[in-house]
Every structure is written in structure tokens, then in C-alpha cells.
Amino acid sequence: MHRESNSSAVLTDTASTYYRFTSTPKMPLLSVAIITHNEEANLARTLASVSWADEIIVVDSGSTDRTSEIARGFNARVIEHMWAGFAAQKNFALAQCTGDWVLSLDADEELSTELQFQMQSLLMSKPTADAFFLKRRNLFLGRWIKRGGFYPDPKLRLFRRTAANFVRTPQFEERPVHETIVFDGTAATLDYDLIHHAYPTLTNYIEHMDRYSSLGADLLVSRGRTSRSTLSFAFNVWLVPQLTFIWNYFFRLGLLDGREGLLLHLYHAIYTSWKYAKAWERARKASS
């Protein structure tokens, strides 16, 4: 049964004024869960946007930079945990949380000021929904990509940790990539943006493409989608990427996002080709 918090709002003086909640020490109102690995370039920005939360859990998988030091500077509880895959790592982080509500963030994301205000007001108002989607604003080379399917890019990130109307505790679906929350309950969408500082450089994005296309290939192999016939190989590796580019760049108006939009949709199409090609390569090696 949902516990009514005895939280009080206290106005604090910061560069971006916001309300801070204080709640009972044994049961924080809001827990923030973040997984990290060498995120010193991003983490301070992320933590600053949730510094008003009652509990911050950072699960780190062997960072060799200042990630843990930065996290502790924001009074986060840092837990070292060997890398087990995205979903497993995030589920471990969720298991450490003690708040009534959990906000799951990536280390390169931050809450906009407007979203901070809305989320704080929401948590004080006894919301009826069990989970909330956040509209994600993706930045590519510093530019907000508004079209082509990259916005509003809703992500379910805020949810009750446990509640009577959940059939099971919410958790991330076990899959190699693009993990999603699995839960039973009602969901709504908040109005303001979660800012995703995704790809500050082309080198960063190409490295991301290589890593995530490999994970995507693993998922395709697990589903038996390995382009075994010549026709399916040509369709997936050559035609699907072209259709993806045409659909997103022209029909979904990605062309209005300037040169950054052109580069992003071009490379996204290449990522699609790599994913299917790597799945075929894995199946080929397994059968030889």
C-alpha cells in the first residue's frame, strides 16, 4: 500500500532555484539510479539536475577515471559491481533503491529545469499513475534533433518502486541492448524534457554505432534473424538501411535539422546495415 510521505518542501538557493524534498531517513521519497563506466565528462551535469532527490545510487563497473569521486561529491552512494550487461546492471541498481519512487537515468542525461519542477510537484501530489514517460531531447553534435523520429523519443524512467497494484516489481527486460522497463500498472507522460547529451562528436557516435550494432546483432541472432538467404541478406543489409534513411530524413522531416540531421540519419542507416551484417557474420561463423 502506498505510504504517504511526510515530506516538506524547502526552498534552496542555487544557480537554478528549485524545491528540495526532505523525507524520513528510513524511506526516501525518490531514489535516482544511474549506472556508470568512465563517465567523468557527463556525470556531474546529470547529478546536478537530481541533487534534490532523497537518494542517489550510482552503480559503477570499474571506472578508471574520476567517476566515483564525482558521484561521492554529490553524496551519491557508489556501489562497485562487475559489468553484467545493460539490463542486468540496471536491475541491480534498482534493487539498491529504497525510495517509494525510482528515477532511472543514463549518465549522459539530465533533467531540464522545467522537468525538475514538474517532477517535484508531481511527487508531492499523490499521483494516480504508477509510472511516467519522459520526453527525451536528443542532442547530436550539440544540436537538438527535433525531427526524423528522434523527438519526443519517450522513455519510461520514473516509476513506483513497489505498489499494491503492481503484479511484479518493475524491472528492466533482459536483452542485450535497448533495455526497457517491464511493469504492470498505469502510465502517463510528463510535459517537459529529459536532455540527452548523446553524441558530442562524430568519433563518439561512430564508436557508439560499432558497439551498439554488435549488441543489436546479438539480439537478432537470439531471434533467429540472421539473413540466411541471399535475398534476405540483400534486403536487410542494403535495402532496409536505404528505406530507413528515406523514411526518417524525408517523410519524417529529418532534413529540417540541418547538416547535423543529415549526418545523423546517414549514419543511423549505416548502423542498421552493420547490425544485420554482423548478425549474418555471427551465424556464418557458428555454422562453419
Positions of predicted regions on the chain:
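Intrinsic-disorder-associated, low-complexity terminal segments enriched in Asp/Asn/His/Tyr and depleted
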Residues: 2, 6, 13, 18-19
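A conserved acidic beta->alpha catalytic loop
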Residues: 49, 60-70, 106
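Conserved donor nucleotide-binding strand/loop of the catalytic core
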Residues: 68-96
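Catalytic-site signature of metal-activated, phosphate-bearing donor transferases
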Residues: 91-94, 105, 112-286
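Short aromatic/hydrophobic "clamp" motif used to bind/position activated sugar donors
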Residues: 102
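Acidic helix N-cap motif at the loop->helix transition within catalytic regions
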Residues: 44, 65-74, 114-115
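Short, well-formed alpha-helical segments that are part of the catalytic scaffolds
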Residues: 34-52
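Cell-envelope/extracellular polymer assembly enzymes that use nucleotide-activated donors
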Residues: 29-31
